[in-house]
């Protein structure tokens, strides 16, 4: 059984929103998404995918995906530049902490995969789907769904807006030298279009407060605003543009925060894999007969895949399953939107 700290983790079971608050949240998120979308369009159409290295310092790369951090205010001033005036760095929830210089992060480049698979891996509107996603992506420690605002539908299977709570591992946390950090935030996913018709997937995380979400004992409340855009630029190649800022609260030093933030942005490379594994699980349950017929055909090529699913007793389980290579190919090539529509309709595999 895989380690799962999501069960009974919800510290704020009383959070809900009125219809008026729901519409306000939708408007708020739409504004953030449009602001960020303009940045992506500018990066593609005006900057021609070129990063201004006077402003941005390279931190880390993974294959063709590159992570940068904005240079310190002192360095920018020496080059005659001002800090980025981005919503991510100016509209975080106030935490009454003294002003501090937080690193703005940037992720640009490409990675392998199909955008629909990626978006199926990203969208996680329920607790069970969050647990499955975390088992593949390893992007958080514990989490809870506080209140759904917009749920995926058959017409828009990748669109969601959910109020959530999560904890994440921070540097030195395992040593007990620093306290656990938690976040209350809105998470939004969906599809937009460039003026030329190109589909662009988006993923937004932005901190938010409610009267019911007061800070918890033995935890430090952090704030974050992070967005990502994904676009298919050729077969099996996804363009990525992501940026954001995380304030972990307390006194974590910049030199410790930057590597952790870089790793978090690089975890986006796991979204496609997550989507593919969810498709295989979906086909295994929905089309078992097709797999059984295929197994009757002798095939020396076999694959062993570790699949995550929710058992009848609510436990998250990872199990090694043997497939013939042809079945794996059939599953990974199936339409992720079909699986996402099933997820939107509340199919048992993705409650």
What are these regions (language model features)?
Residues 1-351:
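Eukaryotic helix-grip
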């Amino acid at each position: 059984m895989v380690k799962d700290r999501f069960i009974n983790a919800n510290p704020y079971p009383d959070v809900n929103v009125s219809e008026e608050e729901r519409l306000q949240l939708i408007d708020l998120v739409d504004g953030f998404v449009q602001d960020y979308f303009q940045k992506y369009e500018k990066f593609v159409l005006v900057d021609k995918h070129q990063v201004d290295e006077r402003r941005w310092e390279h931190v880390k790369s993974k294959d063709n995906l590159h992570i940068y951090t904005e240079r310190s205010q002192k360095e920018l001033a020496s080059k005659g530049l001002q800090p980025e005036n981005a919503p991510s760095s100016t509209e975080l929830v106030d935490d009454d902490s003294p002003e501090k210089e937080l690193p703005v992060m940037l992720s640009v480049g490409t990675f392998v995969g199909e955008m629909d698979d990626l978006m199926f891996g990203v969208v996680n509107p329920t607790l069970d789907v969050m647990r499955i996603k975390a088992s593949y992506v390893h992007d958080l420690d514990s989490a809870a769904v506080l209140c759904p605002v917009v749920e995926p539908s058959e017409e828009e299977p990748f669109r969601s807006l959910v109020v959530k709570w999560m904890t994440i591992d921070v540097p030195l946390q395992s040593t007990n030298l620093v306290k656990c950090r938690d976040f209350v935030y809105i998470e939004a996913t969906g599809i937009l279009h460039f003026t030329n018709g190109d589909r662009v997937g988006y993923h937004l995380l932005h901190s938010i407060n409610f009267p019911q979400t007061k800070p918890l004992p033995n935890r430090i409340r952090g704030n974050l605003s992070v967005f990502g855009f994904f676009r298919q630029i050729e077969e099996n190649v996804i363009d990525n543009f992501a940026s954001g800022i995380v304030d972990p609260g307390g006194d974590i030093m910049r030199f410790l925060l930057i590597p952790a933030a870089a790793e978090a942005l690089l975890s986006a490379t796991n979204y496609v894999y997550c989507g593919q594994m969810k498709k295989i699980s979906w086909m295994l349950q929905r089309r078992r007969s097709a797999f059984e017929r295929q197994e009757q055909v002798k095939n020396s090529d076999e694959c062993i895949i570790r699949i995550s699913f929710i058992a009848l007793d609510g436990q998250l389980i990872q199990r090694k399953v043997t497939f013939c290579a042809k079945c794996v190919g059939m599953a990974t090539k199936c339409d992720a939107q079909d699986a996402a529509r099933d997820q939107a309709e509340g199919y048992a595999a993705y409650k």
